[in-house]
Amino acid sequence: MHNFWYLPVFLKWMLSTNAYCQAPPEDSATLQEPEIGRSSIDSFPTRTDHASHDLSICADSPQDASTSPSCASYLHFSLLQEEYLISSFFDIVQDANPIFSKERFLRRYHSSLCSQDLILTMAIITAKLTQFAGYDDGKHLDAGLDSLLSSSLLDDDLIGDAPSLDQFRKAYLLAFYEFHQFPGHHSWLRIGRVTRMAYRIGLDRLDYIRVLYSDWSTVSDEDIHEWRALWWRIYRLDTYSNLASGTPYLIDDVVINTSFTLRRTEDDLSQEIFLPFNSDGLSEILPSITSDTETLLNNIHTVTIATMRKAGLVIRMHLLRWQDGIVAQVANVERQLATLRLALPLGWLNLRRNAFANEKPVDHHARLITVFHLRMAQLLLSVVECGQRRADDWLSSWQRILEACQDIASLAGQWDSAFCLTVDPAITFTIFTALIFLHLQRKSNTISDESVRSSINHDITVLHLQLKHFGSIWTQARLLTLSFESFSESVSGPLAYSHINLILSRFEAPLHPRWLQFLSSARSALEDLQ
């Protein structure tokens, strides 16, 4: 591993040859979660590139998908421990959980009908994230997780054309976990493989392929629900990973023929709900979505993700420096945002818990995540628009960036850190982006009112604390925290239009290597403009 002992430590490490993840010394066999510090590069997460294990994963029965030999040799959860961890799994990262029906899954689990490989993966991830105290000193968990990540390359895990549902769930969970806990090009590539395999077997067209092919026509309605849920989780992961990295989405929204997950009865003749070909139609499917209260949160989450994807496409145009039509594209997506906000159920954008509606705290936070998506979309659009303005007409657009960041900070002000583990930590990309632009706002020479500056400082404090709470669980969030702290220390201001315009021109994506590299050297770049 390369060592860099000067600030910002993690940026130098992240931009080295292997992006984020470096191979450990040959005598290192386990994957340790780090205690990250500014001068402790050796403690950053690593993973080993072990040879793949041969697993019988294309079988039809769960018994054929046995536990990875390297894991089974040293991981021995007792039955009570395993049952506790599997039950607890449904309390964490709920909006990223690929299992549609908890009750059905637990029935199958207690009947020994689930793949032991999947059960082991769920148990290890739950134990790691919840700091499960009932299992030795954690070394065996680290070794088991290392084995799962290094021996579960997708080309081996999902070999053949028809991997089982449990095998695909396992592959998804590992891709999700690695992306947030051991970020880097390995995790990004793993997500890409999962997404492409989903296309290969037809998850993007479940409602069409089921009619044509016998192997899908015999799948039960309950299992089809589970496959649908898995597809839309992959859709979210494709969104987060590529939007954060500034790379094109692998999934094409225009050609998806897999309906949303709904709890329909046989007597319910309502039509299934599909992602509209035209993004203008997102608001039109909301009445059908809201009619199914059990899946309401889940499906609106997907709709707001789809909206955020549209803003990401505009960012791609910004990356390519396409001047023609970009302002019109910004206006078009903003119209879609406005329509969607108005079409949402009454009180959906309320920052506080809807107590009169008996909204549970966990549902309140799940709803807040969808509002974060909408605010992030607005922030991205505002950044692009501001970058198109000249010195004589940029202030109104610069103010809109502040408005979007303040809206995000208002959401953070209602956040209970106890729920950081219950949601997808991809929200940290939004928090980080808002922090960067709030710092630029407070250092710009456009802010003369001390009360406004004080409000901005408060917003930064709230968002910084929220990011640190996520960082107590996830490596990705810890790295983003370090990035913001380093950037805020290096850029002192006051910043004029020329400085801000330079920074806006360099913005590509929250985790794009060139953007992070620029943040690490922003002081010298800004001083050159003096």
List the model feature ranges, each with a label:
Residues 300-318, 382-385, 438-441:
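Solvent-exposed, amphipathic alpha-helical segments
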Residues 15-20, 24-27, 83-295, 316-328, ...:
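Acidic, Ser/Thr-rich, low-complexity intrinsically disordered regions in fungal proteins
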Residues 162-182, 351-352, 359, 369, ...:
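Long, charge-rich low-complexity segments
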Residues 301, 327-330:
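A conserved active-site cap/scaffold subdomain adjacent to cofactor or substrate pockets
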Residues 379, 408, 435, 467:
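Hydrophobic, well-ordered secondary-structure elements that form the walls
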Residues 1-116, 137, 228, 272, ...:
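Charge-rich, intrinsically disordered regulatory segments
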Residues 5-6, 21-22, 444-445, 451-530:
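C-terminal, low-complexity intrinsically disordered regions in eukaryotic proteins
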